[in-house]
């Protein structure tokens, strides 16, 4: 798309391009970055990477805009990812985990193309990992202490109070200005382990 949007579906026969449902898809952009990075790592095709760098940069810029308030997490509208039949929106864990992986891909691409690390991006990756760990897992802390890097302390406190049935058992699916979603998102929980965001005790849950 003109701003870096990646289509979620392409019909080469009918020449139709779809960018998603009513609100478009956030995760198509994330999977595009991850896929490009994995293909490049597997093949060593530098020509492919060099051709795609301008597109990758547009996608990166668009994702930054989708943070809305520049605080590190992507805001996902209703129908904004693959799970468009589920009523979830806001700061969806699945999309944040993909965003973390996509940013790690961007860091590797930058180092290959420019021969040096993008230190600002490295800092963003570290912050995103902390945000995920702090805001999506309700630990059963008896002393009442709160994690660092809370996105919104009032939302977190209310969510923690209502999460007695799932506290310290699984990652929360999402949160938004309306509060937390306590639904068990199997894919997001698996990704949290596969992408090394979960520590060993959380994996064992």
Residue ranges and their predicted role:
Residues 12-16, 83-85, 172-173:
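Short glycine/proline-rich turn/loop motifs
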Residues 18-19, 49, 85, 118, ...:
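Residues at structural and domain junctions
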Residues 31, 82-85, 137:
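Tryptophan-centered motif/residue detector
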Residues 1-70, 93-100, 203:
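Aromatic-rich carbohydrate-recognition surfaces in CAZymes
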Residues 6-8, 74-76, 89-92, 98-100, ...:
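Catalytic cores of carbohydrate-active enzymes
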Residues 69, 73-87:
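A short, charged helix-loop
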């Amino acid at each position: 798309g003109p701003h870096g949007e990646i289509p979620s579906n392409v019909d080469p026969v009918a020449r139709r391009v779809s960018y998603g449902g009513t609100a478009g898809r956030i995760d198509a952009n994330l999977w595009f970055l991850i896929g490009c990075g994995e293909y490049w790592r597997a093949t060593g095709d530098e020509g492919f990477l060099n051709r795609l760098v301008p597109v990758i940069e547009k996608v990166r810029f668009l994702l930054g805009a989708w943070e809305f308030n520049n605080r590190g997490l992507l805001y996902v509208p209703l129908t904004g990812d693959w799970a468009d039949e589920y009523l979830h929106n806001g700061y969806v864990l699945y999309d944040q985990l993909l965003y973390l992986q996509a940013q790690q891909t961007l860091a590797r691409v930058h180092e290959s193309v420019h021969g040096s690390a993008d230190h600002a991006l490295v800092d963003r990756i570290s912050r995103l990992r902390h945000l995920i760990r702090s805001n999506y897992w309700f630990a059963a802390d008896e002393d009442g202490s709160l994690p660092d890097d809370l996105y919104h302390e009032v939302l977190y406190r209310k969510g923690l109070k209502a999460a007695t049935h799932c506290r310290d058992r699984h990652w929360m699916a999402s949160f938004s200005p309306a509060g937390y979603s306590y639904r068990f998102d199997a894919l997001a929980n698996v990704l949290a382990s596969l992408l090394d965001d979960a520590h060993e005790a959380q994996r064992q849950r």
